[in-house]
């Protein structure tokens, strides 16, 4: 089977997080089953931010047993990346099904248009709460306008979908308010155990000479880093903390400056170790 997977970002932009890894893992597993898989995405590059686009990245690249096709982003508003070239890439290719991940995106809108035009099945999935994500709450006027504009686009994508895959019952309930129940299937996220194997000595590589708590993820306000720092501040003088540190590892999605200020204000410089841009 020929399968097109659509996502706002792909390798090497690992800082984008969950939906990128879901798309790459899915492509890897499907290609191992002898399907022909292509990921259609943007030219977002690896960086300590979510907005570094690189025209020098290959337009087409084979990774493992699947292909990545990139097109340049001409406009980005928050995490809404506009890359019109993807439409023409997808129109020129042939596939039996499209699976788009992260439906509050320009890429998913293009995927829905292509699926309708070519009359092929569209499968969609989302992560993080389509209508309940903290990013949708208490934001500035520009962000609120953007989300309002997205609503008919999101509904069009949902209406076009043959199947909706959710990772849990919580997300299923969200989608059930927007479409019929028989479209929705719960497929829980899996773990590729081969990817969990490592020969790298983490403590040696990053010169950590003590026990540690590890936060690994994006520096974003929705990740709860402020709560974590408040908690560490409460216990920093406990005897056990004399040999234990908090290691924060990731990339900046808008919260790094505030995070560093909190660490300084709480006098946690000797308790917290920051590792930016992990490989």
Predicted regions and their residues:
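Carbohydrate-associated surface elements
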Residues: 43, 170, 190
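An aromatic- and histidine-rich active-site surface loop
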Residues: 85, 97-132
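N-terminal subdomain of nucleotide-sugar transferases
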Residues: 1-54, 64, 93
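Conserved donor-binding/catalytic core segment of Leloir-type glycosyltransferases
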Residues: 4, 207-223, 229-234, 247
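Membrane-proximal helix-turn-helix segments that form the acceptor-binding/catalytic region
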Residues: 113-117, 130, 144-164, 178
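Acidic anion/phosphate-binding donor-loop and adjacent secondary structure
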Residues: 51-52, 173-176, 190-205, 209
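Short donor-sugar binding/catalytic loops of nucleotide-sugar-dependent glycosyltransferases
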Residues: 9-13, 216-220, 225, 235, ...
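Nucleotide-activated donor-binding/catalytic signature segment of Leloir-type glycosyltransferases, i.e.
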Residues: 257-278
């Amino acid at each position: 089977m020929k399968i097109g997977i659509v996502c706002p970002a792909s390798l090497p932009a690992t800082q984008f997080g969950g939906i990128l890894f879901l798309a790459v893992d899915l492509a890897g597993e499907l290609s191992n089953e002898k399907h022909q898989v292509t990921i259609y995405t943007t030219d977002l590059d690896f960086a300590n931010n979510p907005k570094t686009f690189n025209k020098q990245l290959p337009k087409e690249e084979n990774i493992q047993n699947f292909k990545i096709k990139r097109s340049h982003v001409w406009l980005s508003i928050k995490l809404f990346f506009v890359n019109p070239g993807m439409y023409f890439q997808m129109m020129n290719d042939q596939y039996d099904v499209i699976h788009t991940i992260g439906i509050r995106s320009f890429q998913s809108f293009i995927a829905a248009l292509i699926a309708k035009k070519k009359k092929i099945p569209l499968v969609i999935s989302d992560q993080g709460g389509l209508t309940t994500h903290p990013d949708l709450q208490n934001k500035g006027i520009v962000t609120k306008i953007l989300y309002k504009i997205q609503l008919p686009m999101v509904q069009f994508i949902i209406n076009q979908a043959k199947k909706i895959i959710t990772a849990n019952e919580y997300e299923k309930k969200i989608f059930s308010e927007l479409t019929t129940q028989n479209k929705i299937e719960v497929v829980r996220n899996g773990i590729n155990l081969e990817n969990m194997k490592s020969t790298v000595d983490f403590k040696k590589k990053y010169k950590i000479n003590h026990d540690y708590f590890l936060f690994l993820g994006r520096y974003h306000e929705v990740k709860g880093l402020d709560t974590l720092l408040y908690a560490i501040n409460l216990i920093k003088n406990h005897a056990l903390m004399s040999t234990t540190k908090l290691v924060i590892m990731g990339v900046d999605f808008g919260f790094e400056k505030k995070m560093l200020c909190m660490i300084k204000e709480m006098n946690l410089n000797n308790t917290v170790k920051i590792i930016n841009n992990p490989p």
